[in-house]
């Protein structure tokens, strides 16, 4: 092969590289039906609905999927203050996939079991995002965090162990 042929091949390869990288990036960002189905499964078995979907435990999971993950205005109170289950439908629709991947693994206030997300594979965390994103935004934002001793204006569940009542004498 001559010098001109090598230069031509090198130019073609250099021009094709950005197109190849862009195609790969788009392929990774597109939610496949398998990702959405896997995300739905992980949300269901991971207990996400237990806190992030109103009345899910009380109705033994018999809540229409269209109502899933819209947050709950009942707080969880403990030494950390009062936290609320986020409306994941609004939160994830406001994030890029990359932002979700980074945020999902950061420590969160109790009682969120953030360490479960931390320990998942990237593929599983991505599938959860793609599933929730496929549901679209719905519902209202969750109430904001209230620090310890702050004024709580909603119902809340106290997450502090209580001593048993004293036995009658």
Predicted regions and their residues:
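Bacterial N-terminal signal peptides that target proteins for export
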Residues: 2-13
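Sec/Tat signal peptide C-region and signal peptidase I cleavage site
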Residues: 21-27
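Flexible coil segments in periplasmic/lumen-exposed cytochrome c-class electron-transfer proteins
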Residues: 31-34, 45, 53-83, 114-169
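Solvent-exposed, polar/charged alpha-helical surfaces in well-ordered, non-transmembrane soluble domains
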Residues: 37-41, 49, 86, 98, ...
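Peptidoglycan-targeting cell-wall enzymes and recognition modules
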Residues: 81-96
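A structural feature that tracks compact, well-ordered secondary-structure segments
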Residues: 89-93, 102-104, 114-116
């Amino acid at each position: 092969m001559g010098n001109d042929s090598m230069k031509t091949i090198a130019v073609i390869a250099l021009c094709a590289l950005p197109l190849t990288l862009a195609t790969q990036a788009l392929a990774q960002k597109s939610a496949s039906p398998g990702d959405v189905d896997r995300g739905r499964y992980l949300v269901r078995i991971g207990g996400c609905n237990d806190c992030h979907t109103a009345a899910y435990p009380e109705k033994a999971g018999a809540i229409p999927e269209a109502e899933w993950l819209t947050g709950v205005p009942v707080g969880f109170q403990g030494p950390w203050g009062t936290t609320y289950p986020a409306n994941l439908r609004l939160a994830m629709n406001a994030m890029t996939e990359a932002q979700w991947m980074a945020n999902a693994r950061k420590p969160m206030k109790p009682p969120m079991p953030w360490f479960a997300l931390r320990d998942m594979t990237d593929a599983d965390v991505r599938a959860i995002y793609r599933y929730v994103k496929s549901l679209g935004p719905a519902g209202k934002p969750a109430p904001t965090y209230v620090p310890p001793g702050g004024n709580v204006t909603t119902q809340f569940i106290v997450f502090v162990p209580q001593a048993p009542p004293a036995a009658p004498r």
